[in-house]
């Protein structure tokens, strides 16, 4: 019975030593790589860009009425779902996208003012100018492509 405990202790010690050796070997290999820092910076930059893009919905072709309508309905639905789950930031972002693309934003704002709690509606009003500007910039870029 003592032999089993001693054997398992030796096995655990050997496994620990192998793990430590493995870590030291790959750490040394990583540090000696001349491109490591460049690859790490590039990876972090890509992650940052991906994170920024995840927060922004992909805008539809503003000349395609069907795509705009589909985008509008998806944004309203996503916004409502996220607000129901308690994620007010993302929910308001999606509702703001829908308002910015909407053909009659004043009527939609009136409906939202009646249905949303006042703090959430205020959050929506503060985000609306930045989202509208982004969509306006996207529209200007698409017009520049045509010229």
Swiss-Prot record:
Keyword Protein transport among UniProt keywords: yes
Side Mitochondrial intermembrane, residues: 1-3
InterPro entries (UniProt xref): MAS20 (IPR002056), MAS20_rcpt_metazoan (IPR022422), Tom20_dom_sf (IPR023392)
Cytoplasmic side: 27-147
Domain of life: Eukaryota
Regions crossing the membrane: 4-26
Record keywords, A-Z: Membrane, Mitochondrion, Mitochondrion outer membrane, Phosphoprotein, Protein transport, Transmembrane, Transmembrane helix, Transport
Membrane topology label: Single-pass membrane protein
CC per GO annotation: mitochondrial outer membrane translocase complex
Main location (coarse class): mitochondrion
UniProt GO MF annotations: mitochondrion targeting sequence binding; protein transmembrane transporter activity
GO biological process, one term: tRNA import into mitochondrion
Subcellular location(s) per record: Mitochondrion outer membrane
SUPFAM superfamilies for the chain: Mitochondrial import receptor subunit Tom20
Record has Mitochondrion as a keyword: yes
Job description of the protein: Central component of the receptor complex responsible for the recognition and translocation of cytosolically synthesized mitochondrial preproteins. Together with tom22 functions as the transit peptide receptor at the surface of the mitochondrion outer membrane and facilitates the movement of preproteins into the tom40 translocation pore.
Family classification: Belongs to the Tom20 family.
Subunit organization: Forms part of the preprotein translocase complex of the outer mitochondrial membrane (TOM complex). Interacts with tom22.
Protein name: Mitochondrial import receptor subunit TOM20 homolog
């Amino acid at each position: 019975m003592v032999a089993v405990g001693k054997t398992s202790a030796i096995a655990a010690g050997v496994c620990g030593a192998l793990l430590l050796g493995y870590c030291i070997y790959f750490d040394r290999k990583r540090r000696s790589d001349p491109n490591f820092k460049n690859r790490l910076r590039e990876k972090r930059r890509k992650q940052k860009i991906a994170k920024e893009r995840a927060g922004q919905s992909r805008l539809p072709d503003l000349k395609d009425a069907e795509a705009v309508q589909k985008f509008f309905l998806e944004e309203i639905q996503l916004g409502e779902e996220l607000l129901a789950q308690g994620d007010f930031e993302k929910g308001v972002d999606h509702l703001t996208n829908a308002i910015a693309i909407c053909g009659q934003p004043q009527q939609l704002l009136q409906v939202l003012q009646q249905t949303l709690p006042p703090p959430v509606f205020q959050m929506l009003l503060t985000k609306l100018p930045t989202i509208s500007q982004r969509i306006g910039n996207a529209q200007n870029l698409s017009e520049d492509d045509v010229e």
